Design a protein with these regions (language model features):
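A short His-aromatic
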Residues: 47-50, 54
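N-terminal intrinsically disordered/low-complexity leader segments
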Residues: 1-9, 79, 170-181
């Protein structure tokens, strides 16, 4: 039992270390040596758990989907208007992309390596499915306006999430003629402003 627990901790440390490296330099530039050093394990211990870098990357993707998917599932069980729950889901995902390196690395890897169309490892598919199901509920409970197509509505919400996350690290103030040293909106603040723009078209005033 102790040996299994130690093995589980080592595997978890490797996934977190790999996430940090993938997040910082991407898949191609990441090396197993750097990952093992960051995890403070030997190269042999890394090879015991993951035969190749691709296996480690897939484990990061799976962990990212599991962690984020669990939070979305909890929110989906809440009572209340479906549209409001979908908005809360969007805020949760933006927050995770800001604060959780595993989730951030998992989504980056989806763009950098060949990833199967499987929600257990493809976070964007995982999240889009949750948003779609929640907005279908919103259509049923009346919090989504009649006539709104659920599929593009879910895709729009997903685009707000990914767009907000990608722009957060960009000095967008420069595009608006402001100083790069002016105060920057947080990702959630930016998401709130964008949802305020689209809410009337999706859910009404």
């Amino acid at each position: 039992m102790v040996k299994q627990e130690r093995s589980g901790r080592t595997r978890g440390n490797l996934i977190r270390a790999a996430s940090t490296v993938f997040d910082q330099v991407g898949y191609e530039r990441a090396t197993l040596l750097v990952i093992s050093e960051l995890a403070q394990v030997t190269k042999g211990a890394l090879s015991f758990h993951f035969a190749a870098k691709s296996d480690l990357a897939r484990a990061v993707q799976a962990e990212a989907c599991t962690a984020s998917g669990a939070l979305l599932a909890q929110q989906a069980e809440r009572r209340g208007p479906g549209f409001d729950i979908a908005v809360d889901m969007a805020h949760t995902l933006v927050r995770l992309l800001e604060t959780d390196v595993v989730v951030r690395a998992g989504t980056r890897l989806t763009q950098e390596i060949d990833t199967p169309d499987d929600p257990s490892v493809h976070c964007h598919l995982n999240w889009l499915g949750s948003l779609y199901r929640t907005l279908r509920r919103a259509r049923t409970d009346g919090s989504l306006l009649p006539g709104v197509d659920v599929r593009p509505a879910a895709t729009l919400m997903m685009s707000l999430i990914t767009g907000t996350s990608s722009l957060t690290r960009t000095h967008t103030e420069l595009a608006f003629g402001k100083s790069p040293f002016s105060s920057r909106e947080s990702a959630e603040q930016r998401l709130t402003r964008m949802i305020q723009l689209v809410r009337p078209a999706l859910s009404g005033p």
